[in-house]
């Protein structure tokens, strides 16, 4: 379970508020996970635990899934603020 300490913080990285950055964020996270899995070769148990946690987060649509944005969940209130989006 040593390799899990490098995978679990990835789930805590928040998505950007600006919807224009969601694609680049998901590409970065996908490439990071792919390079991590190829370089470190985590054990099967750690990989399964991480994939189960990722599936549960994305399936529940909490809004922190980096693979896609759930259509049911609205944008945060600060996403409509031009001061935040314009930065």
Swiss-Prot record:
Alphabetically ordered keywords of this record: Apoptosis, Cell cycle, Cytoplasm, Membrane, Nucleus, Transmembrane, Transmembrane helix, Tumor suppressor
UniProt xrefs under InterPro entries: BCALP
Domain of life: Eukaryota
Name under which the protein is recorded: Apoptosis inducing factor BLCAP
Function: Acts as a tumor suppressor; induces growth arrest at G(1)/S checkpoint and apoptosis via RB1-dependent and p53/TP53- and NF-kappa-B-independent mechanisms. Modulates expression of genes involved in the regulation of proliferation, cell cycle and apoptosis.
Assembly behavior: Interacts with RB1 (phosphorylated and unphosphorylated). Interacts with STAT3; the interaction is promoted by cell stimulation with IL6 and phosphorylation of STAT3.
Lineage: Eukaryota, Metazoa, Chordata, Craniata, Vertebrata
Recorded name of the encoding gene: BLCAP
Tissue: Cervical tissues (at protein level). Urothelium (at protein level). Endothelial cells of urinary bladder vessels (at protein level). Urinary bladder stromal cells (at protein level). Cervical tissues. Kidney. Ubiquitous.
């Amino acid at each position: 379970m040593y390799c899990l300490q490098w995978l679990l913080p990835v789930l805590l990285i928040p998505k950007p508020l600006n919807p224009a950055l969601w694609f680049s964020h998901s590409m970065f996270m996908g490439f990071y996970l792919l390079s991590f899995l190829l370089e470190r070769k985590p054990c099967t148990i750690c990989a399964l635990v991480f994939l189960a946690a990722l599936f549960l987060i994305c399936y529940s649509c909490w809004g922190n899934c980096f693979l896609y944005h759930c259509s049911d969940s609205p944008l945060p209130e600060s996403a409509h603020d031009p001061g935040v989006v314009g930065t």
